[in-house]
Structure formats: C-alpha cells, structure tokens
C-alpha cells in the first residue's frame, strides 16, 4: 500500500515575497486544516461571539444565507442549528471536507460548494438574504481588482435589501502600533500562539504554533478599516455599519476585529 506523502506549506525561498490571492490553495494543507478547530476552539468561540451573527441576520429578516468562507464549518453549522437555510462555500477542498465531517458529527448535512469567491456566480445561481465572509478570510486577497471582483460577486448573489457581513482583523492597530491581541475573539484555542511574524503595508505574515510544536503560516493583506468601508460603498453597498469585537460603540484602536454589516439597496 502506498504511503501518502505528508503535505508541507511551500512559500519558496523568500516567504515574504509571496503576495498572491491564489496562494491560499497551498496554505490550507491537510495538516493545517486538521488543526484549525484546535486554533479556533468552537466552544470558546461560540461563547465569545454569543448570538451576534444570528441576531444580526434575524434583525434583517434573513432566512437564506451564503457562508462564503465556510472553513471547517463553524458558522454554517451554528446557523443551520438556528434554523437558517445555508449554502456553504469555500475555495479549499480540504476545508469543505473537514466542514462536512464536522457537520455529520452534529447530525447536520452541509450543502457545500467548492468555488473561488471571484467566480461564485458561475457555481451558484440562487439569490440569498445574506452573505457572510468571516474569519478574517477577505484578507487573503492581495489585489484591489480581486477585492472588487469578490465584493461584486457577493453583491450579485444578494437579494434586494440583502446584507453582507464581512469581518477583518484590526490591521490599523497592527500597522500603526504593533500587535497586542487580547485573544478573546475568533482564535480562542488554549496554548495556540497566533501572531504576526512579519508586517509591512502589503503583507501580514502570521505564524501559528500548536502545542505539539507544529508551526504553520498564512500570508495575508493588512486591510485598513476605512479602505474596506470605501470599497464596500464603491461596489454598491450603501448602508454600512462597522462593529468592533461585536460592539457598535468602540474606541478606534481597541478591537481585535472589525465586523462590517453592509446592506444592498
């Protein structure tokens, strides 16, 4: 029987030069995906988020939701359990496989779609009340063209008055003052270190170290909050509310994460 060769992340000779929107395909290898739930810790993340996303979706009358960054299925499964009709999209096959396994263990069946964000409308012809893109996923896009294309795709699959919920790490704080995460939201795993290894205006390279000493990386683009709000507006979203760590009132530099709720008029 052939022994399956262990995958490794490949950033070439100079990792900080890898600034490509398509490179996420090489980052979410099986070993990293298997540890992803250890990083986010479903129970702790559920406690830290509370009912924020469920409450926001219900306030806007949403019933059908497209989870554009399914990952290992955390939000898709929570929303299904809360009664929403969910389609689960991800560009990583490995993530979708893990998400389906996680859902099965909770006696749920995910409706998964493998698709790059920039081509969502090629694979999905339905329209949704809401699109969610969570887990700092949008920062995998390194070019403005890719960001605009992705937001336009999200806009297209939304019904009139539909909403996009998109989050991002507080890169303003990291770029201007350095990294000082409270580690309270999103990445809640015990004894898992998640911190930037290198940062400039075009790259935030994060290092993830697990209790077994295994180390993985992600190269992401450090998006500033006001830039994202401007892009959302220019693509067509008009009513945009930004929350800091699930609070509408926050000090500019305090949150670890921003959550944008943008309405299609």
From Swiss-Prot:
GO molecular function ontology, one term from the record: identical protein binding
Protein residues bound to substrate: 136, 169, 208
Activity sensitivity to pH: Optimum pH is 8.8. The activities remain high at more alkaline pH but decrease sharply at the acidic side of the optimal pH.
Catalytic reactions of this protein: glycine + 2 S-adenosyl-L-methionine = N,N-dimethylglycine + 2 S-adenosyl-L-homocysteine + 2 H(+); glycine + S-adenosyl-L-methionine = sarcosine + S-adenosyl-L-homocysteine + H(+); sarcosine + S-adenosyl-L-methionine = N,N-dimethylglycine + S-adenosyl-L-homocysteine + H(+)
Highest taxon of source: Bacteria
Record-linked InterPro entries: Gly/Sar_N_MeTrfase, Methyltransf_25, SAM-dependent_MTases_sf
PROSITE patterns to which the protein is assigned, alphabetical: SAM_GNMT (PS51600)
Pathway connected to this protein: Amine and polyamine biosynthesis; betaine biosynthesis via glycine pathway; betaine from glycine: step 1/3; Amine and polyamine biosynthesis; betaine biosynthesis via glycine pathway; betaine from glycine: step 2/3
Residues noted as binding S-adenosyl-L-methionine in the record, renumbered to the chain: 28, 36, 45, 69, 90, 116-117, 134
Major enzyme class: transferase
Acetylation among keywords: no
One Gene Ontology cellular component annotation held by this UniProt entry: cytosol
Biological process per Gene Ontology, one example term: regulation of gluconeogenesis
Family designation: Belongs to the class I-like SAM-binding methyltransferase superfamily. Glycine N-methyltransferase family.
Record function comment: Catalyzes the methylation of glycine and sarcosine to sarcosine and dimethylglycine, respectively, with S-adenosylmethionine (AdoMet) acting as the methyl donor.
Quaternary structure (record): Monomer.
UniProt protein name: Glycine/sarcosine N-methyltransferase
Organism: Aphanothece halophytica
């Amino acid at each position: 029987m052939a022994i399956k060769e262990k995958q490794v992340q490949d950033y070439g000779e100079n990792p900080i030069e890898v600034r490509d929107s398509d490179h996420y395909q090489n980052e979410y290898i099986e070993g990293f995906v298997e540890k992803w739930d250890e990083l986010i810790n479903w129970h702790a993340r559920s406690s830290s988020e509370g009912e924020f996303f469920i409450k926001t979706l219900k306030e806007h009358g949403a019933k059908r939701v497209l989870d554009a960054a399914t990952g290992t299925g955390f939000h898709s499964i929570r929303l299904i359990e809360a009664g929403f009709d969910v389609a689960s999209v991800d560009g990583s096959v490995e993530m979708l496989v893990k998400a389906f396994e996680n859902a099965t263990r909770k006696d749920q069946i995910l409706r998964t779609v493998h698709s790059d964000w920039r081509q969502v409308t090629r694979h999905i012809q339905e329209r949704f009340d809401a699109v969610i893109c969570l887990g700092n996923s949008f920062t995998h896009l390194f070019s403005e063209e890719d960001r605009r294309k992705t937001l336009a795709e999200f806009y297209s699959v939304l019904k009139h008055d539909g909403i996009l919920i998109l989050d991002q790490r507080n890169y303003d704080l990291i770029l201007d003052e350095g990294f000082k995460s409270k580690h309270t939201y999103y990445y809640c795993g015990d004894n898992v270190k998640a911190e930037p290894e290198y940062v400039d205006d075009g790259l935030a390279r994060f290092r993830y170290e697990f209790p077994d000493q295994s180390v993985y990386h992600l190269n992401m683009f450090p998006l500033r909050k006001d830039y994202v709000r401007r892009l959302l507006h220019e693509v067509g979203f008009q009513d945009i509310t930004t929350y800091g760590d699930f609070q509408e009132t926050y000090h500019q530099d305090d949150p670890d994460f921003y959550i944008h709720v943008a309405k299609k008029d």
